[in-house]
Regions:
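Eukaryotic intrinsically disordered and solvent-exposed regulatory patches
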Residues: 1-2, 29-33, 63, 77, ...
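Conserved alpha/beta-hydrolase "nucleophile elbow" surrounding the catalytic nucleophile
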Residues: 16-18, 87-96
Length: 166
């Protein structure tokens, strides 16, 4: 949790995509100079999916990863722990899917959502990972998230140039 929640403002709640954690997914955004003004006015709570935090151990044999629904059901517990009354959810990929499920189940806790690269299918994390590397999805992901993730695509691979930082 970064910042101090204010009674009259929602907390920004982030949820990352698969293969990432809150640092690898959101640090580029939250440490950007232009974002500092927002950070002075809002607290941020960044959630890591099980096993995605830095230094996480591998899962034991036979471990079944929680479904998107189960992951969304953990969020009210996090909010209660930090005494958070409402959030603006910010999710990427599978994190966007999880936050959408959370908002549908707990609409009174959600002021709004910022969703990037959402896939609304009811798939598990393994299926999501497989779809990420499919040819068409990989191109779309790279092109859409390049400005957010500070990735440079070689000119020879660029199909079109999108507005944003280069």
């Amino acid at each position: 949790m970064a910042g101090i929640p204010r009674d009259n403002r929602p907390v920004i709640l982030t949820y990352h995509d698969i293969g990432m954690n809150h640092k690898t997914c959101f640090d580029v955004l939250f440490y950007d100079e232009d974002m500092q003004e927002i950070m002075r006015h809002f607290a941020v709570c960044q959630v890591n999916a099980p096993g995605q935090h830095e230094g996480a151990s591998t899962f034991p044999a036979g471990f079944t990863y929680p479904s998107m629904d189960k992951l969304s059901e953990t969020l009210p517990i996090v909010l209660k722990h930090f005494k958070i009354k409402s959030v603006i959810g910010m999710g990427v990929g599978a994190g966007a899917n999880i936050l959408t499920r959370f908002a549908l189940k707990y609409p009174d806790l959600v002021e709004g959502l910022v969703l990037m690269n959402i896939n609304a299918q009811a798939e598990g994390w393994a299926d999501r990972a497989a779809s990420k590397v499919s040819q068409s999805n990989a191109i779309v992901i790279i092109i859409l998230l390049t400005p957010c993730l500070n990735i440079t695509i070689p000119v020879s691979l660029q199909l079109c140039r999108l507005a944003g930082p280069t």
